[in-house]
Amino acid sequence: MSAANMPTTTGAQGSGNQVPRTSTTIVNHRELIKEPKNLDEAANYLFQTLLDDAVVGIFNETHHLRKSGNLAALDGVPEDSTYRMCEMPNLDIFGISTAKKPMDCTCPNCDRLVAAARFAPHLEKCMGMGRISSRIASRRLATKEGATSAHLHSSGNTGGTDDEDDVDWSSDKRRKKSNQNSRNNGSKKNNGKTF
């Protein structure tokens, strides 16, 4: 039996005819293999049958997708350029530079450029809101009030002398320091022991 006499496949007629068609192909191939002279012819027949099945299957599937309107679904959704990954050096996948930038902030109070790491302490000092700044501000207010009250008392005829109205700020500081030293002397140096 020659390849010209073999039945050729003309396409897939459905999944129901697939099993008988495969069995006829196998039977025809076995008949060709029986004679050693026909091995080349049998290989060509098998290759041609497989190629025809594959091509006809693809054509049928494409035709079905085109008729049903689903052919465009094979292409998929086009990718937006905004969502593409960036593959440039020194940039991350979103296109943002990975190099370190010095971060500077502008102080809203004095309009100076301040490093981001120093912005909070600067703002505290600049606005007078921190612990140390509030102490300084309270001293300023106390000195202003003391100066204005002393000025009012001395300008009026209250009969007092200037020495009585003066507030001795340095003596208060000395007194505070001496009180703190006396507290620490007994507890830290001697550990509560007296000699």
Swiss-Prot record:
Residues annotated with Phosphoserine modification: 171
The cross-references to Pfam families, in alphabetical order and at most eight, read: Sgf11
Q: Does the keyword Protein biosynthesis apply?
A: no
- Extract one GO molecular function annotation from the record: zinc ion binding
Keywords, in A-Z order: Activator, Chromatin regulator, Cytoplasm, Metal-binding, mRNA transport, Nucleus, Phosphoprotein, Protein transport, Transcription, Transcription regulation, Translocation, Transport, Zinc, Zinc-finger
Keyword match DNA damage: no
**Location in the cell:** Nucleus, Nucleoplasm; Cytoplasm
In this chain, the stretch annotated as Disordered covers 1-22, 140-195
Q: Which GO terms describe its cellular component?
A: cytoplasm; DUBm complex; nuclear pore; nucleoplasm; SAGA complex
GO biological process annotation, one example: regulation of transcription by RNA polymerase II
Q: Where is the composition biased (Low complexity)?
A: 179-195
Q: Where are the zinc fingers (SGF11-type)?
A: 105-126
Q: Which family does it belong to?
A: Belongs to the SGF11 family.
Which PANTHER family does the protein's record reference? ATAXIN-7-LIKE PROTEIN 3 (PTHR46367:SF1)
Q: How does it assemble?
A: Component of some SAGA transcription coactivator-HAT complexes, at least composed of Ada2b, not/nonstop, Pcaf/Gcn5, Sgf11 and Spt3. Within the SAGA complex, Sgf11, e(y)2, and not/nonstop form an additional subcomplex of SAGA called the DUB module (deubiquitination module). Interacts directly with not/nonstop. Interacts with the AMEX complex component xmas-2. Interacts with Cbp80; important for promoter recruitment of Sgf11 that is not associated with the DUB module.
Q: What is known of its domains?
A: The long N-terminal helix forms part of the 'assembly lobe' of the SAGA deubiquitination module. The C-terminal SGF11-type zinc-finger domain together with the C-terminal catalytic domain of not/nonstop forms the 'catalytic lobe' of the SAGA deubiquitination module.
Q: What does this protein do?
A: Component of the transcription regulatory histone acetylation (HAT) complex SAGA, a multiprotein complex that activates transcription by remodeling chromatin and mediating histone acetylation and deubiquitination. Within the SAGA complex, participates in a subcomplex that specifically deubiquitinates histone H2B. The SAGA complex is recruited to specific gene promoters by activators, where it is required for transcription. Required for nuclear receptor-mediated transactivation. Binds independently on SAGA to promoters in an RNA-dependent manner.
Name of the protein: SAGA-associated factor 11 homolog
Q: Which gene encodes it?
A: Sgf11
